[in-house]
UniProtKB/Swiss-Prot annotation:
NCBIfam families: leuA_yeast, PRK03739.1. GO terms for biological process: L-leucine biosynthetic process. Mg(2+) binds at residues 40, 251, 253, 287. Pathway: Amino-acid biosynthesis; L-leucine biosynthesis; L-leucine from 3-methyl-2-oxobutanoate: step 1/4. Belongs to the alpha-IPM synthase/homocitrate synthase family. LeuA type 2 subfamily. Transmembrane segments: none annotated. The gene is leuA. Homodimer. It is an enzyme of class 2 (transferase). Pfam families: HMGL-like, IPMS_D2, LeuA_dimer. Its main location: cytoplasm. GO terms for molecular function: 2-isopropylmalate synthase activity; acetyl-CoA C-acetyltransferase activity; magnesium ion binding. It comes from Catenulispora acidiphila (strain DSM 44928 / JCM 14897 / NBRC 102108 / NRRL B-24433 / ID139908). This is 2-isopropylmalate synthase.
Length: 573
C-alpha cells in the first residue's frame, strides 16, 4: 500500500489545545438533535426524494419529537423549493419546531432561499462556505482575506433580508428567524482563521440572548481520530466571542467509521447541537447516525428526548424514503442486533432474562420498568418495540441454553437441565446436515419426533393401562404390552408408586427398565401445544434400558398417561 502518499492530520492542521478538559466530562442531558436527512442525506441519494417522500420523512421527524429540522437546499432544485413552500401552507407544524434551510454564500442563492421560507413562522437560515486551504485554493480560488470578505458579504445579506422580512430588526417576531453558519471542512481549517471568520459572522448577525447564532463545525471529511476532533471543538468553545450567545454545533461524517465517537466526544468538549441522519445516510460513508447517538444515551440512563419506541416503524419510513436498506447489523435498528446464535451467548441471555423477570417480581414492578442488566443485550429490545422472539435463534453454532429458551418461551416446555445436552446434540446433527437456521417450530417438531412420538408409536406399546392405589399406600398397574410383531403380553406390577409399579410391569414383558431420573411440568394452553386443553403434562424419564441410558418424553392431559408414554418412549428409543 502506498501509505507514503498521505500525511498525518497533525501535518495538515494545527491542533493548539493542550490543557483539554473534555475527558473528565460526563453525559447528563441530550444535545439538540437536528436531522439533515432531507437536505444533506437527500443530496447523497441516487434517486433524490420527491415531495411525497420528503413529506413522509418530515412527518416522521415531527412524531419522533425533533424540534429543529433541516428540510431543504431551496436554491438547488425546484423540488426542494416547492417542498419548503408546501410546509409554509401547513397548519399542523408545532409552534416549537424550527425549519432550517441551507444556502451557499452566493447572493442570488441566498435571495432564492428567502423566497422559499416566506410565510414560515420559525426559520433558521443556514449559510455555509468552505474555509480549509485546499478548498480555498482549488475550489474558491481565493486567499484567506478574500474568502472572509465573501463570507462577510453573504452574512450581511442574510441579516438584511431577515430585517426586511421581519419589518424591523427588533420588531414583533424578530426572534423567529435565526441564523447558522458552517465553515465547511472546519476540521482542516487553521484554528486562528476559523475563529476570525466565526467571530466576524457573530458580530454581523449581532448574536444576543433573543437570537443566538449557531456555529456549526463540520468534520466534512473525517481525517483524524475522535480525540483530535474533540480537541478542536473544545478549543473553539473556549475561544469564540460572545460564547454565551453562540450555540456550538457539530456535523460529523463517517469516513473513518468513527462519526458517532466524534459526535459524542464533541458534546463532552462543549458542543450543544448535533446534525446527522437517521441510520447514518449521507455522502460517501454517511453522516453521523442520530439513532445510534440517541440510543447510546438511552443505554447510559440519559433521556435522548427523541421517541424511538418503535424503531422498526422508523426504519421502514427511512428505507422507503431513501430507498436504501438498513444493514441487519446496524446498531440498535438492524434485524439481527438483538439476536444470538452462539451457544455461550444464548445461555447467558437465557439466564439473564430469567433473572430479570425474577428481579422485577421481587421489586413488584413490571419487567419493562425493572433495572436492565442482561448479558449481551445493552438495552431491553422492548424499549424500541422489539419482541423477545428473535433474541435467540438456533443454527449449528447454538448451544443447549438457546434451544431450551426457545422451547420454553414459544411452547412452555421447560427442559430439565440434564436433558438439554442430549437434545442439543440432536439439534447439532440436524443443523449440520441441512446447514440452515432452525425456527422454534423446527425445534418443536424435532423434539416431538425424537422424544414424544416414540412413546406413542414404536416397537412397544402399552394399552389398557390402569393404575390402582392399594392398601399401605402402594400402587398396582395392569396393562397390555404389544410388540410391533403383534405379540400381546398382559403385564402387571406393584410398587411404592406408579412409576415403580410400571417398572415391575415392564420387567414382566422382558424389558429391563430402571429409572434414573424423573421430571414433570405443566404446559398451559397459551403455548398451544395441544387443542382444547387448559394444561398438558410433560413427563421426562431418564432410564437405563437394557443397560443403556436414554431419555423418554410423554405428553398428555393425564399425568399418569404422560408418565407411561415417557417410559415407553425411553424403551423404544
Amino acid at each position: 500500500m502506498p501509505s507514503h502518499r498521505y500525511r498525518s492530520v497533525f501535518d495538515r492542521v494545527e491542533v493548539p489545545l493542550t490543557d483539554r478538559t473534555w475527558p473528565d466530562q460526563r453525559f447528563s442531558a441530550a444535545p439538540l438533535w437536528v436531522p439533515v436527512d432531507l437536505r444533506d442525506g437527500n443530496q447523497a441519494l441516487a434517486e433524490p426524494m420527491d415531495t411525497a417522500r420528503k413529506t413522509k420523512m418530515f412527518d416522521l421527524f415531527l412524531r419522533m419529537g425533533y424540534k429543529e429540522i433541516e428540510v431543504a437546499y431551496p436554491s438547488a432544485s425546484q423540488t426542494d423549493f416547492d417542498f419548503v413552500r408546501s410546509l409554509a401552507v401547513r397548519d399542523d407544524i408545532p409552534e416549537d419546531v424550527t425549519i432550517s434551510v441551507f444556502t451557499p454564500a452566493r447572493p442570488e442563492l441566498i435571495e432564492r432561499t428567502f423566497e422559499s421560507v416566506e410565510g414560515l413562522p420559525n426559520v433558521l437560515v443556514h449559510l455555509y462556505t468552505a474555509t480549509a486551504p485546499a478548498w480555498r485554493d482549488l475550489v474558491l480560488r481565493g486567499s484567506r482575506a478574500e474568502v472572509l470578505a465573501l463570507i462577510e458579504d453573504a452574512a450581511g445579506l442574510v441579516a438584511k433580508l431577515a430585517d426586511q422580512r421581519l419589518g424591523t430588526k427588533h420588531g414583533p417576531g424578530a426572534g423567529r428567524m435565526r441564523f447558522e453558519f458552517s465553515p465547511e471542512v472546519f476540521n482542516l481549517t487553521e484554528p486562528d482563521y476559523v475563529i476570525e471568520v466565526c467571530d466576524r459572522v457573530t458580530e454581523i448577525w449581532d448574536a444576543c440572548a433573543d437570537r443566538p447564532v449557531v456555529h456549526n463545525l463540520p468534520a466534512t471529511v473525517e481525517v483524524a481520530t475522535p480525540n483530535v476532533y474533540a480537541d478542536q471543538i473544545e478549543y473553539m468553545s473556549r475561544s469564540l466571542a460572545r460564547r454565551e450567545h453562540v450555540i456550538l454545533s457539530v456535523h460529523p461524517h463517517n469516513d473513518r467509521g468513527t462519526g458517532v465517537a466524534c459526535a459524542e466526544l464533541a458534546v463532552l468538549a462543549g458542543a450543544q447541537r448535533v446534525e446527522g441522519c437517521l441510520f447514518g445516510n449521507g455522502e460517501r460513508t454517511g453522516n453521523v447516525d442520530l439513532v445510534t447517538l440517541a440510543l447510546n444515551l438511552h443505554a447510559q440512563g440519559v433521556d435522548p428526548m427523541i421517541d424511538l419506541s418503535d424503531i422498526d416503524a422508523v426504519k421502514a419510513v427511512v428505507e422507503e424514503c431513501n430507498r436504501i436498506p438498513v444493514h441487519v447489523r446496524h446498531p440498535y435498528g438492524g434485524d439481527l442486533v438483538y439476536t444470538a446464535f452462539s451457544g455461550t451467548h444464548q445461555d447467558a441471555i437465557s439466564k439473564g432474562m430469567a433473572h430479570h423477570a425474577a428481579r422485577a417480581a421481587e421489586l413488584g414492578v413490571p419487567a419493562s420498568q425493572a433495572p436492565w442488566d442482561v448479558p449481551y443485550l445493552p438495552i431491553d429490545p422492548a424499549d424500541v418495540g422489539r419482541s423477545y422472539q428473535g433474541v435467540i435463534r438456533v443454527n449449528s453454532q447454538s448451544g443447549k441454553g438457546g434451544i431450551a429458551y426457545l422451547l420454553r418461551t414459544h411452547y412452555g416446555v421447560d427442559l430439565p437441565r440434564d436433558f438439554q445436552p442430549g437434545f442439543s446434540k440432536v439439534v447439532q446433527r440436524a443443523t449440520d446436515e441441512h446447514g440452515r437456521e432452525m425456527t422454534p417450530q423446527d425445534l418443536w417438531e424435532l423434539f416431538r419426533t425424537t422424544y414424544v412420538v416414540p412413546g406413542e408409536d414404536g416397537a412397544w406399546k402399552l394399552t389398557d393401562t390402569a393404575f390402582q392405589e392399594i392398601e399401605g399406600g402402594g400402587h398396582r398397574v395392569e396393562a397390555t404390552a404389544v410388540r410391533a410383531d403383534g405379540t400381546v403380553i398382559p403385564v402387571a406390577g406393584i410398587g411404592n408408586g406408579p412409576l415403580s409399579a410400571l417398572t415391575v410391569a415392564l420387567a414382566k414383558a422382558g424389558i429391563g427398565f430402571e429409572v434414573v431420573d424423573y421430571t414433570e411440568n405443566a404446559v398451559y394452553s397459551e403455548h398451544a401445544v395441544s387443542e382444547g386443553a387448559d394444561a398438558v403434562a410433560v413427563c421426562y424419564i431418564r432410564a437405563r434400558v437394557e443397560g443403556r441410558e436414554v431419555w423418554g418424553v410423554g405428553m398428555d392431559t393425564s399425568v399418569l398417561t404422560a408418565m407411561v408414554r415417557a417410559a415407553v418412549s425411553a424403551v423404544n428409543r
